[in-house]
Amino acid sequence: MTALNRAVASARVGTEVIRVRGLTFRYPKAAEPAVRGMEFTVGRGEIFGLLGPSGAGKSTTQKLLIGLLRDHGGQATVWDKEPAEWGPDYYERIGVSFELPNHYQKLTGYENLRFFASLYAGATADPMQLLAAVGLADDAHTLVGKYSKGMQMRLTFARSLINDPELLFLDEPTSGLDPVNARKIKDIIVDLKARGRTIFLTTHDMATADELCDRVAFVVDGRIVALDSPTELKIARSRRRVRVEYRGDGGGLETAEFGMDGLADDPAFHSVLRNHHVETIHSREASLDDVFVEVTGRQLT
């Protein structure tokens, strides 16, 4: 663990929102457990990602933390209590956005949010402001049954924010969204973090996780096989090489690679910089996808 990671871990002590220790769960009649001995913590104001292929145990873990599944082994506490120990006040403090939309199809988007707002005892957000934030203002008074899947996904996300939750559970938050609307959702998530909210997301989209998450855990067959910040995971498995694209003597684009160790004293590297027009310089960094495949031996399918 780096000095920075130790500092982050130290700062997390006393501000833990989620603590999971030895968590196991088996569905009735299932041959194998869906979750096997998971251990992790999530600190206040952190975006934590549980990453893995379909069937890895991500959504099951999330459902256990939300309180939708019971009878697990080990410990899974939120604000120092198991979800089953909380009363209705637990759901006043959390927001949930499921991957599969579940709305009242014969109500409008606005009416759906108004209805769900009425279920909370505390103050709630303005439905129109939430709809505008996710790009649905023009469709606020359209029946949800006429919404596309992507529109329903955005409505689900907006609904999860209606009670201004302290802790947000997101399941594949950008799945099926076009780049413009996916960016809207990502920007809202980043803003929530800046306001001190805690976000627990599950996804198999490594690019989204890399962009948003402070830390990620790779999950395969119900087990966590790696856990760290995306940057640390990538650095640990990156090739220490620099790739330079430059214009050759004839004007064509040429490429050269140099080792990072001793780069400051590499005469060939300095010759390229001095004598050619450099277009790009990049370290040969592994992607989070690359790291996942290397660590787990699995593809994200």
Swiss-Prot record:
Subcellular location as annotated: Cell membrane
Keyword Methyltransferase on entry: no
Enzyme class: translocase
Main localization of the protein described in the UniProt heading: membrane
The UniProt record lists the keyword Transport: yes
Gene Ontology BP annotations: response to antibiotic
CDD domains with a match to the protein in the record: ABC_DR_subfamily_A
Matches recorded under SMART domains: AAA
Family: Belongs to the ABC transporter superfamily.
Protein name: Fluoroquinolones export ATP-binding protein MT2762
